[in-house]
Amino acid sequence: MSTYAAYTTSTYQGRGLASGTYASGFGQLVSGMSSAGAICTTQIRDAREREKREIGLLNDRLADYIEKVRFLEAQNRCLSHDIDILRNGFSGGGHVSGLFDAEINQAKHILEQTTAHRSTFERDITGLSAEIEVFRKKWLDAVNAVKAHREDHDVDLDRLAKIEAEISLFKRKIRIVEEDVIRIRRENDGIYNEIARIKQLTHNEIALKNERSLNVSDLLQRINLLQTENNVRIEQELVFIRRDTTADNRDYFRHELQAAIRDIRADYEAISIRNRQDIEVWYREQIRKIQDESVRVNPDLYKEELISIRTTVTNVRSRLAEVEGRNFFLERLIDDLKNNEEAKFFEISLAERDAQIATLRDQCTELSIQMEKLCDNEISLRAEIERYRILLNGANVTTYTSNTHGSGSGIAVGGVVGGSTRVISQTTRTHSSSNTSYSNVPASRGGYSISGNVGGISVGGTIGSHGASAHATGGIIGSGVQAHRGSVSSLITDKPRDRVHDEKGVDQSGRHFHSWYLGTISINQVTPSYIELKNICKIRRVDVGGFRIEQSVNGQVLGSAQINVPLILDPQEVVRFNHRHGKYLGQFFMDVDAFDNSTVARTSMYNYTEPHEERAWFVYLD
C-alpha cells in the first residue's frame, strides 16, 4: 500500500509539473493573444491549478487512510497474537474473546469504509481526468485558432506596414514638394522684386524720355515757327522782287544787296575782331592767374588734383558705359517681357480653347448617351404600347369551358371529372417567335394532359372515354396573334443586335491570349490575383448588375462569382473580381485561393437574363 501511495503521489506530482509547464508555455502565448483569449486562458489555468490542489489533497487523504489501514493491520496482528496466546494459555471461552471480536469487527468496519471511500476517490479521479482531457482539447483548439489568427494577423501587419511605408513615402514626397514650392516662391518673390525694380527704372527712363521728347517737340515747334516766319518774309520779298522786273530795279537791288552784304560782313568782322580781342585778353588773364597759382601752389597738390580729375572723368565714363549697358539690357528685357506676355496670352487663349473643346466634347458625349437612352426607352415604350394594345384588343385572353359534350371548334381541352364543368382562363404573352408550341404539359391533377400549338390554336386531350370542347371568347385567336406578330417582332428586331468581337493579342507580360465577347463588356485580363472586366465603349455607360463570372479547368468548374448589386460602368471603366485572400481589396471576389491563368483554364461571363448563354470567354494560348 505504501508503494502504491508513493507511485500515485509521484504520478500526480509529475502531472502537476507538466501542467505547470503547459501553463507557463501557454502564459508565454498569452502575450500574442487578444484580451478575450487571454481571459479564457487564465480561467483554464486557474481551473487546472485548483484541480491540481484538490488532487494533491485527495492524495494526502488517501495516504493517511493507507497509513491508518497499515496501523490497524499491525494492531490486528498484535491482537491476533494476543488472542492466540490467551487461547493457548486458557482453556475454554471467556469475555476476552468477545472483546477482541468486537474490536476486530470494528476494525473491519473501518477498513470497509476506507475501501468504499477509496473507490469513491478513484471515481472522482476518473471524472477529473475526463474533464482534464476535455479542457486539454479546448486548449489545443484555442492554440490552433490563435495560430490561424496569428497568420492572418501577420498578413494584416505586412499589409499595414506596406501601407504605412507608402504613407511615409508620400509624406516625404509632399515635404520635398513643399520645400520646392517654398524655394520657388522665394525665387518668384526675388524675380518679382527685380521686375518691380526694373519697372521702376523703366518708368523713370520713360519719364525722362517723355521729358526729352517734350523738349524736342518744343524745339521743333520753335524751328517750324521760325521757318514759317522766314518763309512768309521770303514770300513777301519775292512778291516785291517779282513786281520789280526792270533792269534798273535789278541793278538797284543788286547794289543794295551788295551794300547790305558788305555792311553785314563789316559788322561780322568787327564782332569777330572784338571777340578775338576779348578772348585774347581772357586767355592772357587766365595764363597770368595760372602762373600766379603755379607760383603759390605746390606741384604735388596740382598732380593730385589732376589725378582726381582724371579719376572723376574715368568714373564718369564708366558710369556712362554702365548706364548704356543697363539701357541696352533694359531694352532687351522689355522686348523679352513683351514676348513672354504675348506667349502667355497665346497660351491662355489656347488653354481656354482647349477647355471649351473638352467641354463641348463632354457635352456631345453626354448628349449621345442620353440619345441612346432615349432610343432604348422609345423601343421599350413601343413594345409596351403594342403589348397593351394586344391586351386591350383581348387577343391574348382565352376562356375554355369543358363539359361532357363534344363540339369541333378547332380547340379541344380534355378534362371532365364526374360530369362537372370547368372554366379555364389562360393568358398568354406574345413573343417575337412566329409559332410557339406546347405539348405534353402536365395539368394540376393526375391524368390531365394538354397538347397543341399556339398559332392554330388547337389544344386537345382525353381522360378515359370522355371528350371535351372549348370555345374562345375573344374571337379567332390565331388571326389576332398573326395580326400583331409582325408589329411586335419588327419592334424587337429594330433594336441593334450585340456586336461579336473576336480578338487575339499579347498582354503586358508577353503572353498570347484569345478573347471573344458580345456587346461592349469584355474580359480584359486574367491574373492569379484578379479577373478584370472592361467597358470598351467610349461614349456609352453599361449596367453590369447580375453578370456572372465562371472559371473552369479542363471542363471542371473551379469557381464562380456574380455581381448581385446594380453597377453601371462608365466608358472605359473596369471592375475586378479578387480571390478569397484579396476580398478586402475590392467589392467582388470569388471563393478560390487563386485564379488559374494556364492554357487549360477558360474564363467565361454570363448575363442573368440569359444564364446559359456565354456572353464572353478568355483563354491563354501559351
From Swiss-Prot:
Q: Pinpoint the LTD domain residues.
A: 509-622
Identify the stretch(es) annotated as Coil 2. Answer: 256-399
SMART domains assigned:
Filament
Q: Does the keyword Cell membrane apply?
A: no
Ranges for the region named Coil 1A are 55-86
Kindly list the biological process annotations in GO that this record carries.
Answer: heterochromatin formation; nuclear envelope organization; nuclear migration; nuclear pore localization; post-embryonic digestive tract morphogenesis; protein localization to nuclear envelope
InterPro entries per record: IF_rod_dom, Lamin_tail_dom, Lamin_tail_dom_sf
In its UniProt entry, what is this protein called?
A: Intermediate filament protein ifc-2
